[in-house]
Amino acid sequence: MRQERIKDRVLKRAARAWGFSDTEMETSFDPVVAMMLNALSYELEKVAHELEDSKTRVVERVLEIMFPEVTVGAKPARAIMHASPIDNNMKVSLQNQMTVTRRIHNIYNPLAPISKEIALSPTLEVKLSSAEVKYIAYERNLYEVSNLFYKDAVYDYKHSLPSGEVFLGIELKNANVSELEDLMLYIDIKNNHQKEMFHYYLKQMKCFQDNMPITVQEGYNVPVKHLDIENIINRKYTHLDEVMQEVNDYYFDNFYTLKGVLKSKPIKEYSSEYKYFENVTNNNDNPLIWIKMVFPESLIPQILDNVSFTANCFPVINKKRHTINKTLGDFLSYVALETDNSIYLDMDSVIDGFNNHYEIKEFQDSVIEEGNAVLRTGGVSRFDSRSASELLQNVLDLLKDESSSFAGLGKDFMNSSLVEINQLLASVEQQAKENSFLKSNAPYLMIKPKLNESIGKSFIINYWSTCAEEGNDLKAGTILESKDDLYFVSKESTLITNTVGGLNKQNNKDRILAYRTALLTRGRIVTFADIKAFSFNHFKTYIDDVKIEKGTRKEISVKAGFSRTVDIHIKTNQAEKESLSVTEWDYLCESFMKNLSSKSSNVFPYRLFIDS
């Protein structure tokens, strides 16, 4: 309630109590009374604002308790990367780092853009092969893959293949390699409208090498969901483990593994249907392994025109490793986890001078056992203090509000001092904005060394950070440099897809949506109301409305008729959606459908319709 309205109500109440009418109450009171009522209404307005602030703080605390950092923390961007191994059947490591320097527009000084290093790391230790897909043949077409994104037609090819058959010529990059084991292919289609149909046919694909059947396994060439005994014994599954599992599940449908061993042999030893590839095989510098993929005949070549087959690809996320070497004393030691203007993501390891791995625990009570490390972050860990940014913001607001009161004294010296103070405050405020001085508490470790062993020894502390939203929209084709620890791949790696999905820490509005979804659905999506709550929680401010209807569709299979569906119509918020790139919006929609299908118990398929 505004100060003028409060004063008006108090005046009316006072007039009735003292026997004055409404028409004469303005002129009947002494000016001192009016000044006192002014002061009273001003203080009451401040009390009202404090009550609103208290409500906000209570809601913030409740949300922090209900949704810890694992749920509402920052999410790294993810993408698909290609890297060529030096040796055959080498595994990538979760510790590997591929980096690129990105220039970010500086709104405060456009002539001095900000340079930020974006680091990407694998989410799965897949095996890479010393081979690449060199030729693709279907219908009347034979293409040579010139690089990862373009293919050139071979014009002297005159043969026509049966409908639904695709031949791949896989080039061996190493002269010492004569066979490939568990070759993994990344298969993607550029046209979103054909994606559902193509993936339906892709699941029915059969593979052969010279009439010998090849076992095709959907997914990666290493297990995704395996039981990690070390993780269970030594530490809890962390936020980073959940993120990597989510990324692996998201890209799972695009990877196919040819199980077993593919051996190289001369083209003349293949059956007669491969004789049309003799010219390109003999003219190629390196040996080729030819495989045949058989799809249903209803797969038209117009769909295959938009399909790419790529080897040596794997999912990556934006995470950067930090290492601290610190000598600790004989009692409890504190180590701040600095991230250089990035967002803290997760802990990796704490190792003492005797190579002992310390167990990393969440802060629960004041007792810390010897040989343990405790991670403390903001939120639930601190109830009785505000962060430095909150205190600074409070001081800025207070001095802005009260400076007008001092200026009313009319003294030139005080007025000039207040002008100078306001200028300094404006400079501090701009500096805080430029440095992204957010209301978040920097995490830190509390380490209690083992007695008589690790005292005075150097500890090695490894942890991860992410650029969150700043890591989004790195374009496909971006070349990344490999760090020194990436020995088994070439010095350069290439992005196959744009980076998408990076999110900063959720604000209170997003937390309320997540809280509402958790209360309504309890982790299960059954009713239309559950779908609606899940939709708002996923798309957040990018949509205004959601409508759920029952519908029908024609099945993709030529042998099936119509089937019932659940149609989800979302109305987008155009002003908010304009801030997203096309790839980011496509990722939002695709991840929404995948998460909805995995969490829902509905037997009917879902369809998503976008209403502008």
Where are these regions (language model features)?
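Intrinsically disordered, low-complexity, polar/charged repeat-rich segments
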Residues: M1-S612
